[in-house]
A protein has these predicted regions:
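Conserved catalytic motifs of ABC-family nucleotide-binding domains
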Residues: 102-103, 128-138, 150
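Helix N-cap at the start of a conserved alpha-helix in ABC-type nucleotide-binding domains
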Residues: 209, 216-217
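Conserved catalytic loops of ABC-family nucleotide-binding domains
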Residues: 201, 217, 221, 225-244
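Membrane-spanning alpha-helical segments of multipass transporters and channels
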Residues: 264-266, 274, 278-286, 296, ...
């Protein structure tokens, strides 16, 4: 069901004024997707957690760490035949269907993961993850600025066209929201995710459950928009659907059917039409669409053929033979004219310099912090209350030798208060990883530029919080009231806070789950608290433990203040 030249020229004329607006300087290069004998493997096995498993995971933590370090444990994999073979030309849309949605997700992730150049293929998951404090227009503008150099007029036109294309003009100034903050609906969020994926400029787009949360009319409009963009820019799109009408079904050029980890069909969708009266398939309901008959084909009766039999039958079919011929021809052409491995298909595109990306990310991070004014105000109030509490508890300490021990306890309490307030970064980093993973995969941001901008914004915001805390503590407790001493006290606390923030973020990035991140951060904090020099002085520590003093920010800050 290939698209003819007349429809392509019509789509191109429809989008001719988008060439410099919709994807300026990021026109995707037509890419052929070909794979033979591909075997998708599961990422991991996630058992159902129980109370007993939580206790055992805590006790057996050293053994599990040793297993990961020395690779003693082998993953349990279901034996599967590497029967996945497909040849997709530029400008084609592929429908991925399976009785189990997880099989479609695994197949799409395998396509995106095995590419030579990052950003050439992107995966849009079924879960729509966006910054909840931004509006729809703000998100699109930041995504446009992150990809390439644009003039202000072109940026405005691109935003208007995107909003009009996906029919989300009415929510341009509405917060995206999340489970707590009220925002846009699920269908509007899904259309925003599709628009964001198009802005990535990737050559191959993989959509998991493309029409999730959309009604029939909106789903048809969304698929037709993607069809027009594919015809205009010769993209390659893989999409899985939970339900599809006959019009949506006819929009796709190829079909991949999966059952129990085997490819049971690969070819044009029109080949499924004669299967309505197949006695070996589960009968579809009356007036069912072709997509329903497809599911009836891959969900057979208990007495019908197995997945192995269906895969073997597909390998003996004419569609598999045509795919094998196309793959052999394509591989022969690739071997005849190999491209240099260092030549990226995006070397000609005009990109932002690193400092411009940092500036753009600085603006966005400042806007994110300012939008979340409630959390910002609460954190300032907590620092004020904490500083006043410590200051009033140690009000007007004696400046003689009698107050030396109390003064040491005061400084140690200040160090602990600053360190405890930075523990919240573990939860923020762990829960925010899906969004970061998405923007890094789309190449909207680079990790180095993102963390540089994040540290700069944190320094500006956290300096005000630490300043409020330092004023309350320093002047209520009658410490040495000179400008150099106060500035030194403030600088040590600020450096301590930033060190703990970065340490907790590193723990959140290294741990796989939220539970393991919290336990690791708590263990590290308690260890640093005990060996900081107040509870257990450095002189009384065993020789094998003294070297941790140089890795302990609490110990370094406490010794600097003393």
């Amino acid at each position: 069901m290939a698209t003819d030249s007349s429809s392509r020229s019509a789509s191109r004329s429809q989008f001719r004024d988008w060439d410099a607006i919709f994807l300026p300087d990021l026109t995707p290069t037509p890419t052929t997707v070909a794979f033979k004998g591909m075997l998708p493997k599961p990422d991991a096995i996630v058992p159902v957690p129980t109370v007993a498993s939580a206790v055992l995971s805590t006790i057996t933590l050293p053994w599990r760490v040793g297993q990961r370090l020395f690779r003693l444990r082998r993953a349990h994999e279901t034996p599967r035949n590497p029967t996945f073979s497909l040849f997709v030309r530029p400008g084609e849309m592929v429908l991925v269907a399976s009785a189990e949605p997880a099989e479609c997700t695994q197949f799409l992730r395998a396509i995106v993961r095995h590419v030579s150049y990052p950003g050439v293929a992107v995966f849009c998951s079924a879960e729509d993850v966006h910054p909840h404090v931004l509006t729809v227009e703000q998100l699109l503008r930041f995504r446009l600025r992150a990809r390439a150099v644009r003039s202000p007029g072109a940026e405005d036109d691109a935003v208007e066209l995107l909003l009009r294309l996906f029919r989300i003009e009415s929510i341009r100034n509405t917060l995206i929201g999340n489970a707590v903050v009220r925002g846009i609906s699920g269908g509007e969020r899904r259309r925003l995710s599709v628009a964001e994926a198009l802005l990535s400029g990737a050559n191959v787009l993989c959509f998991d459950d493309l029409t999730r949360g959309l009604d029939a009319a909106t789903a048809l409009h969304c698929v037709q928009c993607l069809r027009s963009v594919v015809d205009a820019y010769r993209l390659t799109i893989f999409a899985s659907l939970s339900a599809a009408s006959d019009t949506i079904y006819a929009t796709f050029d190829q079909l991949v059917a999966i059952r129990d980890g085997h490819q049971v069909f690969g070819g044009p969708p029109t080949a499924i039409r004669p299967l309505r009266d197949d006695p070996q398939t589960q009968p579809a309901p009356p007036l069912a669409s072709y997509f329903d008959h497809l599911h009836a084909r891959i969900v057979p009766r208990a007495s019908s053929r197995t997945a192995h039999d269906m895969a073997d039958a597909f390998q003996r079919s004419a569609h598999y033979a045509d795919t094998a011929v196309c793959l052999a021809t394509y591989l022969a052409e690739e071997q005849a004219s190999p491209r240099s491995s260092n030549q990226s298909p995006r070397h000609h595109q005009k990109r932002h310099a690193t400092y411009r990306k940092v500036v753009a990310l600085l603006q966005r991070q400042m806007l994110l912090a300012w939008k979340d004014r409630f959390a910002l105000t609460v954190s300032w109030i907590l620092f004020l209350v904490l500083g006043c509490t410590i200051g009033l508890a140690c009000f007007q300490l004696q400046r003689t030798g009698a107050g030396a021990q109390a003064r040491g306890g005061l400084l140690y309490t200040c160090v602990l208060g600053i360190a405890v307030s930075a523990q919240v970064e573990v939860a923020k980093t762990t829960l925010g990883r899906p969004l970061l993973r998405k923007v890094f995969a789309y190449r909207f941001e680079r990790p180095a530029t993102f963390w540089t901008a994040q540290i700069a914004v944190d320094t500006m915001l956290e300096s005000m919080r630490v300043f409020i805390f330092a004023i309350c503590v320093y002047f209520l407790t009658a410490l040495h009231r000179t400008a150099p001493a106060f500035l030194y006290f403030l600088a040590v606390l600020l450096l301590l806070y930033m060190c703990n923030v970065l340490m907790n973020r590193a723990i959140g990035c290294m741990c796989r789950t939220f539970d393991s991140a919290i336990r690791t951060a708590t263990f590290v904090f308690v260890f640093y608290m005990i060996t900081a020099g107040y509870i257990l002085s450095q002189a009384t520590q065993p020789s094998w433990l003294k070297w941790t003093y140089y890795l302990n920010p609490l110990a370094l800050a406490f010794s600097a203040l003393m």
